[in-house]
Amino acid sequence: MRPSDYPPAFDPAEVIAAPSDTDPIEVGVLIVGGGPAGLACAIRLGQLLDSAPAVRERLGDVPVAVIDKASRPGAHLLSGAVVDPVSLKKLFGDRKRIADMPFQGFVSHESVYYMTKKKALRIPAPPTMRNHGNYVASLAQLGRWLAEQAEEAGATILPETSGEKLLVTDGRVRGVRTGDRGRGKDGEPLPKFEPGSDLIGQVTVLAEGTQGHLSGAAISRFGLEGENPQVWALGVKEVWKVAKPLDHVIHTMGWPLRGAAKYREFGGSFIYPMGDEMLTIGMVVGLDYRDVELSVHDLLQELKTHPKITRLLGDGERVGWGAKTIPEGGWYALPKQMHAPGLVLTGDAAGTVNVPALKGIHYAVESGMLAAEAIFAALQPGEVVWRPGALAPYDEAVRSGLIGKDLYRVRNMRQVFEKGFVRGAAMAGAATASLGHVPHGRVGGERDADQELISTDRSKNYPAPDGKLTFDKLSSVYLSGNKTRDDAPNHIRIETRVPREMAELWVRMCPAQVYEIGPADAGKVQVVVTPSNCVQCGAITAKGGRLTPPEGGAGPEYTLT
């Protein structure tokens, strides 16, 4: 049995529409997503337009608009995060210093451990995981700060605005239709109903982040699929207030994950200092795992019972929690083109993540800058920004620059772990030493949803929640500040009558307790969905369902993640 055997009632074509003639809102450059890629694009465009009044005038009254589905900038952003500052330095130049940026601290040293249930063996940090000179950050806080810089650069930011449909006519992207707000559970308009609008831009930048709704539709509509299918990991993260500050970055591998190839459990944990009073701890696991009883949230709770981790947390207090997927396909899963007429794909929406280095934020910033520069060049007199090929220089800059060079060097690193931890670690070492030439050629892959499922008794090892060190899913969702209305329409598409094994996969997988097993009938069970619990992590899209945009302003209210 595979998750892909039970696809949801969803067709990417339903996300594509023609613009309406009814009161469209025209902007110059329309950016979808207020994360590091979209905001870097807005900032760089503002810098370029400052010295080009004719181009600014050509873009109209709203030269740059950023829409974001979160209630405010940063509220849906989550990452580890240790940030390489190279792209932020390039973006701001002399305008901002590192000291001006909301970093939690400088990484001066780090440790990597191979874990067993009771022991932690310190091992040399792989070259790809060395972080000296980088900075620890809360991506939610960094996103808020970047939004302030974007507004100072002249961008208009529209929070609580989801992108529902991609507007396409005559083979080019014209903009985005935003989602309605204020509908009831059955789709009926409520007293405060607000219909969506058509936002028309000369060019549209998709910077939605992981599992982008419009990005996936655009890739399908324009045939941009990469050589390998994209695959994802799920990260679950907690922020703790602790009495004794942590003074270095920690990564772990091994326990509580199992190394045998039959389980396909790829991942590890991170523990980062966040100033004098807090630290962040998280677990990341590839969603190509096979065991229906695996739960990343519960693996994180299990990890915290390790003696080494328990000592770090001490008598601390959990003050933050969140979950998000991460694109892990690498070089061969990048779209074969990151542009189409009137469109560019940036950041996690395009899959620009370096898995062995555990890095994606500076690549998102870099791609946003490169997109801005390509758009600006295509807006010059005599150019037509939406003509076929006008934005091709963006692709060339991504693939030949920092992003492409880094991702190509680690092009098969994620895929070699499909043979298990020991063999994968050996192959990863060879790949690092050979700058990616070993293994030779392209190592293929399968979609996460195409993995054959197995069932074990894995869940018996998960610790019971005690409310002090270990926690259940519902209390964690509460800590995320989730604002989704109980009477909002269901934004999750799944097949609701499936074999029990399939239902158990979704129940365990979801970190927010969205799915429950209902009555059984004729060899199948009913899956009960509670969409108001959803923190929009995107895991269901990787494992057989489909996450669509809820109404703008719904979802988590991340502040420390």
Residue spans of the language-model regions?
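Glycine-rich Rossmann-fold phosphate-binding loop(s) that bind the pyrophosphate
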Residues: 33-36, 139
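Active-site-proximal substrate-binding core of FAD-dependent oxidoreductases
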Residues: 59-61, 75, 351-357, 369, ...
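FAD-binding beta-loop-beta segment adjacent to the flavin cofactor pocket
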Residues: 4-5, 324-351, 355, 475-487, ...
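Iron-sulfur cluster-binding cysteine motifs and their immediate structural context
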Residues: 503-560
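C-terminal auxiliary extensions adjacent to catalytic cores
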Residues: 417-468
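Extreme N-terminal leader/targeting segments of oxidoreductases
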Residues: 1-29, 44-65, 476, 481-483, ...
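N-terminal FAD cofactor-binding segment of flavoenzymes
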Residues: 44-48, 60-117
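Predominantly flavin-linked oxidoreductase catalytic cores and closely associated redox partners
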Residues: 57-60, 140-145, 149-312, 370, ...
